[in-house]
A protein has these predicted regions:
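The feature captures the conserved acid-bearing segment of alpha/beta-hydrolase catalytic domains
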Residues: 190-247
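Alpha/beta-hydrolase active-site loop
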Residues: 106-155, 268-270
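C-terminal catalytic histidine-bearing segment of alpha/beta-hydrolase fold enzymes
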Residues: 43-46, 105, 114, 240-282
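The serine-hydrolase catalytic nucleophile loop
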Residues: 68-77, 94, 225-227
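Short amphipathic alpha-helix adjacent to the substrate-entry channel of hydrolases
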Residues: 72-90, 232
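Short beta-strand element of the alpha/beta-hydrolase
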Residues: 55-64
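Primarily recognizes the serine-hydrolase "nucleophile elbow" in alpha/beta-hydrolase
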Residues: 137-209
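N-terminal cap/lid segment of alpha/beta-hydrolase-fold proteins
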Residues: 25-52
Length: 282
């Protein structure tokens, strides 16, 4: 009897770790890497391919205030979730700000969701500096290079060239938005999702703007107002946009257990439904 219990526990553990061991992973340095970059800081992509691909690919831009990357929550866990839905996941390591924090820096004013006009052109960057703005520019180059590389490998990775888009978290959302605004045809995403990540620069919506999905929480200072402003910029330009503002005030926006106690935990399933509605997946 004890042996049977032990084998059952062992089988359960194997099942728990199976998705991690079967997930394909490849790494590629991006052409935006320079000789001056430290090895650990060079921009690159990590590729997670599903066992049963449906042709869609998502470039994951993790958050981290442009100073670190929330890799485990925003890439590794998210890639596993996307792979379960047949979607290829591409984790992006982009350039980060290595400059010391300015001395005596004050907290920015807290802007409520009801005042999106506080962010003209949806620029919700709390503090523009020369070094900070240059890093956003470099990170956007990394993101565009990632989309280009996915398209170049599309046949090999069983990806449709017209079903490649961004999902950005926090600062990674700002990177994805910046990349989208300046992309050429090979770099342009087919869809853009930002998860509590407003624009970090003035928004100029491109003529061929992809459909935009925005997810945020009503009581998130500055972020919610900045994302409402982003939605308005997209709509004023005649582009397709959808905005989800969750009001229950719970949860970070990583993958969350489906407890039924909060609406924020449904963001990932709602994103999958949105991708279906946009004909990116079946």
């Amino acid at each position: 009897m004890e042996y049977r219990k032990y084998t059952k526990k062992l089988a359960l553990l194997c099942m728990l770790f199976l998705p991690l061991t079967t997930m394909a992973q490849k790494q590629y340095y991006l052409p935006t890497a320079s000789a001056s970059d430290d090895e650990k800081d060079k921009p690159m992509i990590e590729v997670y391919l599903p066992q049963h691909p449906n042709g869609c690919a998502v470039v994951l831009c993790p958050g981290g205030a442009m100073r670190w990357l929330s890799w485990e929550s925003d890439v590794v866990k998210m890639a596993s979730f996307l792979n379960e839905h047949g979607i290829a996941a591409i984790g992006l390591r982009y350039h980060l700000n290595k400059a010391p924090m300015p001395q005596g820096m004050k907290m920015p004013p807290m802007v409520d969701v009801t005042h999106p006009e506080a962010f003209p052109q949806a620029d919700a960057n709390p503090m523009h500096t020369a070094s900070g703005d240059s890093i956003i520019f470099l990170a956007a180059l990394d993101a565009k290079a990632a989309i280009r590389m996915v398209r170049e490998h599309a046949d090999e990775w069983k990806i449709s060239k017209d079903k490649i888009g961004f999902l950005g978290f926090s600062a990674g959302g700002g990177v994805a938005i910046a990349a989208t605004m300046s992309a050429d045809s090979m770099e342009r995403p087919d869809f853009l999702c930002t998860n509590f990540g407003p624009s970090l620069m003035p928004v100029n919506v491109p003529q061929d703007a992809p459909p935009l999905l925005i997810m945020t929480r009503a009581d998130h200072p500055n972020v919610a107002a900045g994302l409402v402003a982003l939605f308005m910029e997209w709509k004023k330009a005649g582009a397709n946009a959808e905005l989800h503002i969750y009001g229950d005030g719970k949860g970070p926006y990583e993958l969350m257990p489906q407890t039924g106690e909060t609406t924020t935990e449904t963001w990932s399933s709602q994103m999958i439904q949105w991708l279906k509605a946009k004909a990116m997946i079946e």
